[in-house]
Amino acid sequence: MQRLLTIFAAITFGSLITCSTVAADEPPAKEADAKPASIFPDANLEAAVRAEVFAKRYNDEPITPEDVANISRVVGKDKKIKDLSGLQHCKALMLLDLESNQVTDLTPIADLKRLQSVTLAGNKISDIGPLAGLTSMQLLDLSNNQVSDLKPLEKMSNLRTLYLAKNTLETIDPIAPLSKIWSLDISDNKIKDLSPVAKLGWLTTLDARGNQIESLSPIVELRELDMLLISGNKISDLNPLVEMCQKDAEGDRRFAPYLEVYLGENPIDEKAKADHITKLESFGVDIYDK
């Protein structure tokens, strides 16, 4: 009996050793594949993009390049967005509205060739160089930033609407070739010369308030104007405006009867101004002198 127990114990011990050896030789079980990281380092931007990704709109799964390859718009107003990294994957993007954020670098959107409408008003942008190749652009709003150089815009020949209010512009020369613009806001800058506007033949609205403009001569050939805002400049002579409106009134009456002019806070002689306003009103022009 004792011998049988000894044999049984030996067999059992040997089995344990064998099992242990086999277990030691087996490769460790694979860990579950880790989820891919989000392509958007800025969580606030990711949230704005997620709203356009139907499959992940209501969960927190990381967004991948494939998820955003075909989205056409991203809207994220006043969301404290700082970093646009990740947007470079949105190859089909046509509309981007990130008004009132903290964006400084536009590099991630430099190759989004389908962009037609970009609103970045109220950010911290000074360099618009990355926009230079976006020639499909039709609406661009850069109001309330720190832009001083418009050269990157000079090939945006499809631009219709351009808002540049409250920047640090001293010249608008680069926009002279952009003949399709019909609405231009350059208010509250440091602009002295309107000459580049002379070639914008389709211009209907010009907001140039709060600059250092002295002469209206460059606008005399603009035949589509219906709103002119020039308050708060250094204009002392309204003759160019009177002459262009008189010419229109005596001709095909294309714009004068529909034109609104805001000209308050300019150093215009009161008597001359009264005479000019009377003439302009006789042509059908609405004058606002406050």
Regions found by a protein language model. Name each.
Residues A92-M94, K113-L115, T135-M137, S157-L159, ...:
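Short "repeat-start/strand-capping" segments in structured domains, especially the N-termini
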Residues L153, R160-D226:
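Eukaryotic tandem repeat interaction scaffolds
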Residues Q2-L95, P108, P130, P152, ...:
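N-terminal capping/linker segments that flank leucine-rich repeat
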Residues D97-P152, R160-K166:
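A generic tandem-repeat structural signature
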